[in-house]
Every structure is written in structure tokens, then in C-alpha cells.
Amino acid sequence: RVAAVGADGRLIWDKNDSVYNVNLTEKLLATVLSKLSNFIPEAGIWMNTQRPEWNDANNALVGYGVSMVTLYYTRRYQQYLLDLFSEVEFDQVEISTELVELLNSINSTFVDNRHLLEGKISDTDRRLILDRLGRAADSFRAGLYSHGFAGGRVAVETSQLIAFCQTSLEFIDHSIRANRRQDGLYHAYNLMTATEDGIEITYLYEMLEGQVAVLSSGYLSPEESLA
């Protein structure tokens, strides 16, 4: 296909043998859903690919590293989406059926476990949440690899998108609070250990990029930033 049409051949194509086009809302959601599908509560975003951010020194963490740095930036991004969807003039937006299913699966995982935010999340509950998020992403990915996008669209209320942003931000903020060190700094990278029925978390030493990321996340108040 690349030989026939050039660089467009590397894009996703639809059943009509044309480049599959989506709107900006769908592109913005796809970005954050790919991150949240690898979210480990109170730990960060699981670095389970072979491209763990810009810092080559963290290549050794692939597979069992968890990035709070990525979660800090995800918070900033999700807050932007919340503000954006709260200000748009439309009430509905059409999104690919496959992505809506992923969105609903991730959102229901957060909603069903919202009560856990009242305290520290146990290793068992952490594993249950990660497994549900991971299965949602696996189903989405397997469907695309096998069949591609079917071409169907679902109208999603902007109020649903706002609610999703709010709920996910609650989980993100809970994790940020859990990663505040006793000296007032914030953890940058953690390690996860998968046991038979849970996910255990251990902390690495402090790193500069963790402080830069949390300062830009929008989580801290001006007073906390100066402290």
C-alpha cells in the first residue's frame, strides 16, 4: 500500500479502501485512553512498552517500571480536556464505536471502584483495577488488528465526556497524593511487582523530572508549589 499511495499507506484505512478519518475529539480521547489503560493506582502509568519516555536511563525499567512523571502530565492533559468539553457549544459528538466501547470500559472501571479513593488502595484492589483496564485495552487492540474500524459511529453526550474527565482526575489526584514524600518532594518513578493476587509498589529515589512534572500538572496550589 505504501508503494502504491505513499505515506498515507501507513495510516489506518476503512472498509471502503480509503484513509479512516475521525474528528479532533476522538483523537484527543484516544491519546488519554491509551495512557489510562495502563494506569496503576497509587503508582502511575505502567511502562510496559519498549519506549519509556525520553530518558534513556529508564530503559532498564521496561516491564516493571511505573511512571508518575507520565501521570503528572496526563493530569495536565485531562484537566485541559475537562475545560475544553465544559466550554464547547455542541451537546453531542460522534465517535467510532470501537473507541466508545474502550471509553465506556475504562470509565466504568473508575466508577465501580470510586469508593476505594476514600483510603489507601490495597494490593489486591490495585490488581483488579489494572486487570480491568488492561482487558479493555486488549479487547480494543485485538479488534482493530483483526478487523480494523467497522465504520460505525456513536453519538456521545459531552456531559458523559465531562463526567469521565472528572472521575479519572479523582483517581489521578488520589495517586499524586499517595506519591508525596515526607520531605515534600514527589516520586517520579516506581517499581511494580505482580503477585498471585495483587500488585505491590516500591519507590525509587527522588528525581528532578518528577518535581518538574508535578509542578506543571496543575495539581499543586501556588502555596504548595513554593513550599
Regions found by a protein language model. Give the residues of each.
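Acidic, mature catalytic/reactive cores of soluble proteins
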Residues: 1-227
